[in-house]
């Protein structure tokens, strides 16, 4: 039986190391429109160029989800298919994958497909994809993998730290006043993905040092107890180094994986931003 683990580019992995036997990982890209340019969020994307252009334009940039046809093409050739999408509150990717599933199963009734709305982005999506690969490698049946990943998802969370909010302001999700204050006062926005998949603000911290402490405090408050952490970041090695030290002071054996953000996650996290998935 051939497996496919499929994720849209709300996941930061472009490829997966140590793939389970008879398993393929496929990234289905969203597109991001900046001014007149449309960027496809795949392995060839020059994220630095996209971000530079995004900050140079005064108009709102926007993303577009994969089409059902994009998903159907990614399903081809597998018996067992599991899809993970960015939260449905930010994108139509989940709905697109569900439509593709319905059509594909009519044409391939012996295939098995499960679509997961991560209710999240970045690091937490990465955690789910990583766990799926481990579950398949254990030799579990399709239904067992679905049950296990559903249970696992209930024990993962997303914490985000934003140093810039230009996109949120341009898209009308934050007022210009707040955007100006964040820039002038060196404010970091610390928040989480809620249980319904919305991004909620938890704290405003002034400066990197206070943001690191705020992020760690929120992790502990949410029930973190030394489990795996995946941090997707947009050019903020210093934060990761100091935050990792703080985590390992309390949890010496904590496993921390660090990834650069995908194009889509760079679009949301912006320069210096982080999207951190962790187990509770």
Task: For the regions a language model picked out, list residue spans one by one.
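Flexible, charged surface loops at secondary-structure boundaries
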Residues: 1, 75-78, 222-225
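Generic beta-sheet signal
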Residues: 3, 81-83, 227-229
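Short beta-strand segments
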Residues: 6-7, 85-87, 116-117
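Mixed-charge interfacial surface used for oligomerization/domain docking
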Residues: 10-20, 24-26, 30-31, 37, ...
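Alpha-helix initiation and N-capping motif
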Residues: 47-48, 68, 129, 142
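Active-site cofactor/cluster-binding pocket
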Residues: 66-101, 105
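Glycine/charged-rich beta-loop-alpha catalytic/anionic-binding loops adjacent to active sites
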Residues: 78-83, 106-116, 258
